[in-house]
């Protein structure tokens, strides 16, 4: 007997539906005899397996500690791989500054705020080097990742904006603290500059590194070329660092310049470290703590906003 292909397909479809109904009936009758607690457990396990397989679901708690630490460790290893540039170079630059000022000014330079000029100069050079290195760490990392096109390797992992900022800032703080320790040891050995209030030194070095690390993130995100990043560093960061009382006391400035200096957060970072190292300063360290802390909050807020929205990162 000749059977059409359409009739064969209809027969196969009817048989498939019949088998499916029978299988479902067996499954329902089999599960019906199970206790209610077992049924609830099976349903809960099925729900968990479904949720665990969904894309984009965080499965490691409220904070991705492992991811944050991994990003921070990557930033630390990045500058430690070139330790001759990140550790030795700042020490040599600080030594050159002290040597040049010693030769150029000589012993005829009087005391500044009751201490020898070289002793007064050491905390300023230490702090200036710290803030420059903290800025360079985050800015160069983000800018190079954007320009080379591998920023996606940082944005793709399940890290929130807060975790990304903490990871990058942690690397900047580590670099700033390492540079501070190296220069402080050199100052103690060659100039005899000790620590009058070590806690203040630690506080302002950490706050200065956080502030400059955040500014470095902003610069790295904003810059699309290394030329733009260099312009930000040369025309904004370096002048603010040099005009913040690094080499002088602001008491020698005209009143107008003193007012401008007091509006500069970098001044309070340098002044706070100077107070902690040699016990003299142009302003109260408590005022500096408030100003630098407020500046850190503002800068970190901008970093979080840009990381959360992907400004100039995802476009």
Where do the model's predicted regions map?
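Low-complexity, intrinsically disordered segments with a bias for serine/threonine
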Residues: 10, 27, 41-44
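Histidine (H) residue identity feature
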Residues: 2-5, 262
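Basic polycationic patches enriched in arginine
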Residues: 4, 9-10, 14-18, 29
């Amino acid at each position: 007997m000749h059977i059409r292909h359409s009739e064969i397909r209809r027969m196969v479809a009817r048989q498939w539906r019949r088998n499916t109904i029978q299988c479902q009936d067996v499954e329902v009758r089999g599960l019906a005899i199970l206790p209610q607690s077992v049924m609830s457990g099976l349903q809960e396990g099925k729900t968990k397996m479904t949720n665990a397989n969904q894309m984009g679901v965080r499965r490691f708690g409220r904070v991705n500690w492992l991811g944050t630490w991994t990003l921070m460790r990557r930033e630390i290893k990045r500058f430690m791989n070139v330790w001759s540039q990140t550790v030795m170079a700042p020490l040599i630059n600080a030594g050159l500054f002290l040597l040049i000022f010693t030769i150029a000014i000589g012993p005829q330079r009087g005391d500044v705020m009751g201490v020898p000029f070289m002793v007064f100069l050491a905390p300023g050079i230490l702090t200036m080097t710290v803030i420059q290195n903290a800025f360079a760490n985050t800015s160069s990392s983000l800018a190079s990742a954007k320009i080379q096109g591998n920023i996606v390797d940082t944005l793709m992992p399940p890290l929130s904006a807060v975790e990304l900022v903490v990871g990058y800032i942690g690397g900047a703080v580590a670099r700033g603290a390492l540079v501070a320790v190296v220069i402080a040891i050199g100052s103690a050995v060659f100039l005899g500059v000790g620590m009058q209030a070590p806690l203040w030194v630690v506080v302002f070095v950490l706050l200065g590194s956080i502030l400059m690390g955040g500014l470095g993130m902003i610069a790295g995100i904003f810059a699309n070329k290394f030329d733009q990043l260099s312009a930000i560093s040369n025309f904004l960061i370096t002048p603010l660092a040099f005009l913040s009382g690094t080499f002088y006391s602001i008491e020698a400035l005209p009143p107008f310049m003193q007012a401008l200096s007091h509006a500069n957060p970098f001044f309070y970072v340098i002044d706070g470290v100077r107070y902690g190292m040699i016990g003299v300063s142009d302003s109260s360290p408590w005022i500096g703590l408030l100003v630098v802390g407020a500046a850190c909050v503002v800068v970190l807020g901008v970093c979080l906003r840009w990381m959360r929205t992907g400004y100039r990162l995802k476009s």
